[in-house]
Amino acid sequence: MISVVYPGTFDPPHLGHLDIVKRSCELFDRVVVAIAKSPRKYLLFNLEERVDMFRVMVEPLGPKVEVKGFDGLLVDFMRKEGLRIIVRGVRLFTDFEYELQIALNNSKLAGVETIFMMPSQEYIHISSTIVRDIASYCGTLEGLVHPYVAKKLREKFHCP
């Protein structure tokens, strides 16, 4: 059985994230979405809210997908969960450069492998930052996030 971890802050999770999870399910037996607490970042949603939103998004995918929050180093979480493979979505060359540095360090420090996936074309333009910006002006989120995430964003920004 091949299990992978798909880590991130996911603040908020969007359809590009869901695309990577769905496609990972086609390739691997088990996908663990690991949501980082990330206390050094300013976050719109707390860890519990982000875990909740991601769980709702992946519910139709069934038991192949688990969503868990974690605090600390990803490699420590992976060791605890018995995971050795990281899946990362890479949209642009600048993403790849940053992700490659992290992947090389993870490999050297903990012997874990990283697999890079390009998002599907219809999601390549989506980022959590863009979603937050649009939501902060009560703009339309259709085609960017799951309806449940859109509801949570509207509530957070007091949108009608």
Across the structure, where does each feature detected by a protein language model lie?
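Nucleotidyltransferase catalytic core that binds NTPs
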Residues: 1-160
